[in-house]
Amino acid sequence: MVAITSLAQSLEHLKRKDYSCLELVETLIARCEAAKSLNALLATDWDGLRRSAKKIDRHGNAGVGLCGIPLCFKANIATGVFPTSAATPALINHLPKIPSRVAERLFSAGALPGASGNMHELSFGITSNNYATGAVRNPWNPDLIPGGSSGGVAAAVASRLMLGGIGTDTGASVRLPAALCGVVGFRPTLGRYPGDRIIPVSPTRDTPGIIAQCVADVVILDRIISGTPERIPPVPLKGLRIGLPTTYFYDDLDADVALAAETTIRLLANKGVTFVEANIPHLDELNKGASFPVALYEFPHALKQYLDDFVKTVSFSDVIKGIRSPDVANIANAQIDGHQISKAEYELARHSFRPRLQATYRNYFKLNRLDAILFPTAPLVARPIGQDSSVIHNGTMLDTFKIYVRNVDPSSNAGLPGLSIPVCLTPDRLPVGMEIDGLADSDQRLLAIGGALEEAIGFRYFAGLPN
């Protein structure tokens, strides 16, 4: 068995032949088998993975590009190896032969299909408590949620079952589970990554995203997926101007999250970061106008189109009838039973509220001369499995989905890049993540800033395997 480190470090070990690709793969397989209770993985092909590793070792190219690195793919992304099911019964045997472009680009660079990650059914939730495939468990505490909807990928990366993973993010689904599991989650600018052959929620908002152990690993994967091979120059902390929009993003935080944010800001300020306290005008109003109307209207249309294109034997009705998770069924059935968003509401959201939200971000960054904004990824840490509809937060019963996505939703609706970085553990040893957002197409600059912040913060923990 070999010591499992980051993706970047593993590539260096493979290049130096400190261990073989097969030795790495056997170690990861053993870890996956030891961590079955997390229910992070939906599908695997260990024999196929071993054959691929042996082939790489014979050719002697391990560590070149991504050669020899097994990755976890969320179960709504076509890999050509594992079923593309979105973890819902009607699609459980749907296995497209052609992979998505995001998977194909990684495979072309030498990455291996390591596993398919369990997820919130049809990506429509943030707990990954899936009544069809079972709840994914948080590797820091198996009684708690890992976040979602890419919860299986986050749990697999956090417990080092896989060296990295690809999820999808409509409004939170990469960054939130990364934060709750203590790893890094990156949502790129909308359109930076190809989104074909992925079971959709909302084409206006959906994008593949990266979950990894550190920012350096995200940079490696981003470079390959986006096709931007140039290196990102390091960014010094001194001189960075980072916005703190305290109203909205810092409202009603869990006490542990508030302390983590305060401590992180103080640490970074002492290292030379200039923080600008300024609120984003009309953010709540614009975000509410752009958020749910777009996602709820587009979901049935987008899913029907996907089924027409790729799964001719399964109808939209088959999928909806087969849904097992009550929270997802309630949302889906509402779109069928006459409570759906009207075309007029959708057009207003997409062509009025959304452009105004985007313009508001641009003006905010320009007026305050900002490099990024910083805020807690989620207002609260991971909570017990089963609180899918409501959760008590600071003494008040709140909608689980809305409180968890509150901070990450606005930039999703604006199509902006966001990077969640773990900053500390609470006294209960639960991770807290903080997110930096940038303007559209500032992805590489944002990753460079994230790398500098990560180094300064110095989070050095990982979850380990369940007992």
Swiss-Prot record:
Q: Name one GO biological process term.
A: auxin biosynthetic process
Q: What does this protein do?
A: Hydrolyzes indole-3-acetamide (IAM) into indole-3-acetic acid (IAA).
- Short name of one Pfam family for this protein? Amidase
Q: What class of enzyme is it?
A: hydrolase
Under what name is this protein listed?
Indoleacetamide hydrolase
A single Gene Ontology MF term assigned here is:
hydrolase activity
EC number(s)? Answer: 3.5.1.-
Q: Recite the UniProt keywords alphabetically.
A: Auxin biosynthesis, Crown gall tumor, Hydrolase, Plasmid
Could you name the active-site residues? 74, 149, 173
Q: Which organism is it from?
A: Rhizobium radiobacter
> Does the keyword Endoplasmic reticulum belong to this entry?
no
Q: In which pathway does it act?
A: Plant hormone metabolism; auxin biosynthesis
